[in-house]
Amino acid sequence: MSSAPNIFLSAGEASGEHYGAALIPALRALYADARFFGLGGQRMQALGMERIVRAEDVAVMGITEVVRHLPRIYGEYLKLKRSIIERKPDLAILIDFPDVNLSLARTLHEQGTPVLYFVSPQLWAWKKYRIRKVQRYVDRMLVIFPFEEAFYQGHGVQADFVGHPLTEVPLPTITRAEFAAAHHLDPAKHWVGLLPGSRGKEIRLNLPEMIAAAKQLGHEHEYVLPLAPTLTEAQRGHVRQMLAALTASAHDAAHDQAPRITVVADARATLHHARASIVASGTATVEAALIGNPFVVVYRVSPLSYAIARRVVTVPHVAMANLIADRRVVPELIQDDFTAANIVREMQPLVASDRAREQMMTGLAEVRAKLSTPGSSAIARVTKVAHEMLQRRAALSRVR
């Protein structure tokens, strides 16, 4: 192996790309001439990674959506597989996205490439049979939730808890007054965050019920809706249509006053300054827990996806904050329980009662403590392990 290692990176989702984009410069600090290729988003490409496959071309959610797009996803997977066989990378770093990455791990293993997996597949929740692939094809597993370390070690996988990268992200510096001025919000009112997800399908499934809940919570609050930068213009247009319909329905009913929903770009600032938020299950719930302000978790998928998930998911909670705490810290409204009336029931105390807010914030502080690790950052720990694996490969190459 030369001093310019050839590194395969695979990150198929927004959170994975965030971590991948942090790893590229960290590895370049050790290997200035390192070459990166694989699956990733625009940020990773901007940092010099050659994208064999674009993350936006393979990122889908839900079992039914995966099935519908399977031919296209398989075609993109074959591109990645061919690139691995042709280039024989010195190291592979696979980030989350198990439906693709566990298959790539086999190809990499067969090519003799060391495999480092960062952000574990949630095999502890479902599809535990896939642990066999991890045992066979993954050399090191680096996990971001503390209970995952024991799970993998119990199955004979070399696994280490490195802390959650989001614990290292500082709180937004923008003040409440500045945020209010920037978005024409009333600082005298309570603000409620609406976070329906970062994908078009999530917004279609989640936002209408959130809007209905806002109507019931009332116009005496401000509602803040951050939209992910990855949404297409068509998806943003769909959001505008939903908000326009809300205003039109209020005009039709003269006695009604529509809640004011303001679209913004900064989800973290929204979570930081909102009195409480309604958050779709996903990485945003981890961000919300770490920021520490109260929230309610909601989750909805297609009926078929949910029917299958009910049979195979074995964990007692959906919200990661509750899994980490091993108790109910935040409310969960799943599938049929995800209704406007139920949201209002859970949100009203968080908006109106300081005591209810403080009780939840105490639980969220415990979650944050469990996700943190003393010393170096999660990205620094991953970089260190990657460096050790490259050094070991170089030493073996010299022996041969």
Swiss-Prot record:
GO BP term (any one): lipid A biosynthetic process
Encoding gene per record: lpxB
Matches recorded under InterPro entries: Glyco_trans_19
Enzyme Commission number, as recorded: 2.4.1.182
Species for this entry: Acidobacterium capsulatum (strain ATCC 51196 / DSM 11244 / BCRC 80197 / JCM 7670 / NBRC 15755 / NCIMB 13165 / 161)
Pathway in which this enzyme or protein is active: Bacterial outer membrane biogenesis; LPS lipid A biosynthesis
Tagged with keyword Hydrolase: no
Summary of the function given for this chain in its UniProt record: Condensation of UDP-2,3-diacylglucosamine and 2,3-diacylglucosamine-1-phosphate to form lipid A disaccharide, a precursor of lipid A, a phosphorylated glycolipid that anchors the lipopolysaccharide to the outer membrane of the cell.
Record's protein name: Lipid-A-disaccharide synthase
One Pfam family per UniProt: LpxB
